[in-house]
């Protein structure tokens, strides 16, 4: 009877240990990709972007990877001061670099209306599990990096200026996009939670017609849908899909 009890206890301990081991591990998200189903008027492109066409107005949204952002937005090739990523920073004891923000490239080609205006601050991410994320404005990111200064002088100040200068040049601006012209820039959101697999990126109140005081009298709302998988493991290399 004692041997049976010992076997039961040892089996229970082993089972609990197995549960703990299987439950351990970190979550790693795969890059966002366009969902199969999109709203009317949307076209999924080979580069992973989605384009909405309204006659000769084209609005394209594309999720960016950290590798792409490091190539596009690293001053003088120095990834350590990239405002959109952690650059080449690897935490002690780890072999990979975490993602800092979800970043989308927004491109507009206006050959249809006298002028168009998109305010990126009016955008929003809605997740399939009902989480909602508001965009990060220049002011939000300015305060974020100011709070991360190592010091108010010296190298910390130089890196802060490099980052904010890059943000000022590359964030999508809410300027008028006049007929025959294009606009290009990034829209940034807070890091998505680990349980988020499907998202809708909404561009709201896109103004396409204005009155004589430049107040919008006609606007449209667009929704771009993206998916990603969530992997679990100790490192990105050994992570598997988490069902």
Predicted regions and their residues:
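Sec-dependent bacterial lipoprotein signal peptides
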Residues: 1-24
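Conserved functional micro-motifs across diverse proteins
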Residues: 24-243
